[in-house]
Amino acid sequence: MECPHLSSSVCIAPDSAKFPNGSPSSWCCSVCRSNKSPWVCLTCSSVHCGRYVNGHAKKHYEDAQIPLLNHKRSEKQEKAQHTVCMDCSSYSTYCYRCDDFVVNDTKLGLVQKVREHLQNLENSAFTADRHRKRKLLENSSLNSKLLKVNGSTTAICATGLRNLGNTCFMNAILQSLSNIEQFCCYFKELPAVELRNGKTAGRRTYHTRSQGDSNVSLVEEFRKTLCALWQGSQTAFSPESLFYVVWKIMPNFRGYQQQDAHEFMRYLLDHLHLELQGGFNGVSRSAILQENSTLSASNKCCINGASTVVTAIFGGILQNEVNCLICGTESRKFDPFLDLSLDIPSQFRSKRSKNQENGPVCSLRDCLRSFTDLEELDETELYMCHKCKKKQKSTKKFWIQKLPKALCLHLKRFHWTAYLRNKVDTYVQFPLRGLDMKCYLLEPENSGPDSCLYDLAAVVVHHGSGVGSGHYTAYAVHEGRWFHFNDSTVTVTDEETVGKAKAYILFYVERQARAGAEKL
């Protein structure tokens, strides 16, 4: 929106010496010292955290209004309202009086000058950091891809994703998907599409969460992000262009609230699928179909029309079998799926006392068994029997008719109890390799020896107590090495650490598919 408060609030010099040292994206809040979601005041250059960290940037604005309310405003006070601030990671500008993002500038273009100065500071800090690391590596006998920093192993080749304000749920999913090899390779090999018009060509576009633009492509921005994550040219990538498109086409995820990573993943895959079906990213429908032809036709699972890489990789088919307990009539229904949501069995959900610590541990097999076991539907789910002509008691059982190349398993850790959505914090043991899905197949005799074996590719973990709070990180394996992705920080880790994680979403890749990808 056009903000009328810029002239009275943007008072700092673009190259102000008052700015802190170091890269702007890692600046700390002057109150709580948090480096998450830093915002710089464009009146006094002080740095505070965003409203969904500890809210000190907003409090800074509110505190500045008290003298103006208690005293007659002087000309000097009119100019010092501390109303406008800038995100130190995405460089978007926000006005607290308008309570919205700002798209205009002052007559002298001060906002853009501050933005460019912050970008230069970020680039300088990054260049200095790379030079320092390169020098250390030259003098080190360690692996050329690794560098020991403060006792942890930092990955040089992997790229983190900057947190743009409680966007860790998006970052964890993006990092996980970038390590599903066949899926990632497909997007990286798509031709690039330039969406900017002549007025903005050659200039970086700074999107805000309230801007409107009909000419956007989720596929194109997703492709750019995947290309940036493993090119090794930077330690952290700022995905504001992708997030702008996400915020535009998926309004549920606008703002700075913490969101559910699984819900975001489903929305993302669904919208990628729909856009690829229509060829909206500038690639013709025939070109997309030609790309898809490289994937085995027998492994495609259509959801809402023609198959795409989304359904070819993640698509499976469930058989839902319902039996009437009165007349014995059997009803079968086939449902396509992109992921399976598994309950954690109730016997494992209660908190254990110290003397119960050595009791049985919940395993992924327990969750899969609970999902596929025969169950009697309760009174609220009576089945409409076409033979009996009325709702009857019945049993239900799921079979997997077709397994996907990438099996996504979502553990249902959040449950509604009364008016609260509580988290099930139970540890679930899961295999890092050799997950055998054969016993859950409808026709296991028709499957090949390795077609039912899956190896773990990525894990999304939720840290905290509630879906609307906490923090998301991801573990993923790349070229045989496990990495931990915590927003902009990427560290090398080991299998033991991964195995101890309290998984929320597990991504498994078919062993046959992985072997095929390695041959390409």
From Swiss-Prot:
Keywords, comma-separated and alphabetical: Acetylation, Cell cycle, Chromatin regulator, Cytoplasm, DNA damage, Hydrolase, Metal-binding, Nucleus, Protease, Thiol protease, Ubl conjugation pathway, Zinc, Zinc-finger
Reactions catalysed according to its record: Thiol-dependent hydrolysis of ester, thioester, amide, peptide and isopeptide bonds formed by the C-terminal Gly of ubiquitin (a 76-residue protein attached to proteins as an intracellular targeting signal)
Disruption phenotype: Usp3-deficient mice show normal postnatal development and genome-wide increase in mono-ubiquitinated H2A and H2B. However, loss of USP3 leads to shorter life span and increased cancer incidence. They develop an develop lymphopenia with age with increased spontaneous DNA damage.
Modified residues (N-acetylmethionine): 1
Domain of life where this protein originates: Eukaryota
Sequence positions that bind Zn(2+) 1: 3, 5, 95, 98
Subcellular location: Nucleus; Cytoplasm
Binding annotation for Zn(2+) 2: 29, 32, 49, 56
Matching PROSITE patterns: USP_1, USP_2, USP_3, ZF_UBP
Signal peptide coordinates: none
Residues at the active site: 168 (nucleophile), 471 (proton acceptor)
Domain annotation USP: ranges: 159-511
Primary role: Deubiquitinase that plays a role in several cellular processes including transcriptional regulation, cell cycle progression or innate immunity. In response to DNA damage, deubiquitinates monoubiquitinated target proteins such as histone H2A and H2AX and thereby counteracts RNF168- and RNF8-mediated ubiquitination. In turn, participates in the recruitment of DNA damage repair factors to DNA break sites. Required for proper progression through S phase and subsequent mitotic entry.
Family membership noted in the UniProt record: Belongs to the peptidase C19 family. USP3 subfamily.
Subunit structure: Interacts (via UBP-type domain) with H2A; the interaction is less efficient than with monoubiquitinated H2A.
Designated name of the protein: Ubiquitin carboxyl-terminal hydrolase 3
Native organism: Mus musculus
Gene (UniProt): Usp3
